[in-house]
């Protein structure tokens, strides 16, 4: 998902995860009608969607493990053994299993984003929304995070990612949508003969 600053990329993402009301038109996501979405339904919507933010949104007063445990408890998990196993599984998947005891401020930006991606995977979401997931990262770390997201996508997960980084779009060729003038368009790659 591309577009200039202020084109509506983040607003679209926020609408998809229930943070903003759908203003006009129709829309549904993972079985929820965005026009009729009620406040009490939002937690259930978010259990089906993994969200990755540009600024990570990790709790600095908790370890990596406790950040993920917090999410599991908040989404209704009860069994401690299952929660521990799930946390280990997602941390292993993003290459952060050995850093479970660290606080977010002890991690690099790329490591924090890996933890944020692990958090998004906790409830086996149908869709992952990634809003500028490489926006605060250097080019090398951005490629590493994109490689990870690409690997997750290849495992069968759908990902909608907003970005300003056109180099990443060129390197990781996927369907591209553009926000412009309050509308959404599919960008069709042009081929030369």
Predicted regions and their residues:
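Conserved signature/switch motifs of ABC ATPase nucleotide-binding domains
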Residues: 102-105, 123, 155
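Catalytic Walker B motif of ABC-type/P-loop ATPase nucleotide-binding domains
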Residues: 128-131
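Conserved ABC ATPase signature
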Residues: 103-107, 111-113
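Short coil-to-helix segment of the ABC ATPase nucleotide-binding domain corresponding to the Q-loop/switch region
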Residues: 62-70
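ABC ATPase NBD coupling module
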Residues: 34-50, 152-154
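Conserved ABC transporter NBD signature motif
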Residues: 25-33
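Helix-to-loop junction immediately C-terminal to a conserved catalytic motif
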Residues: 17
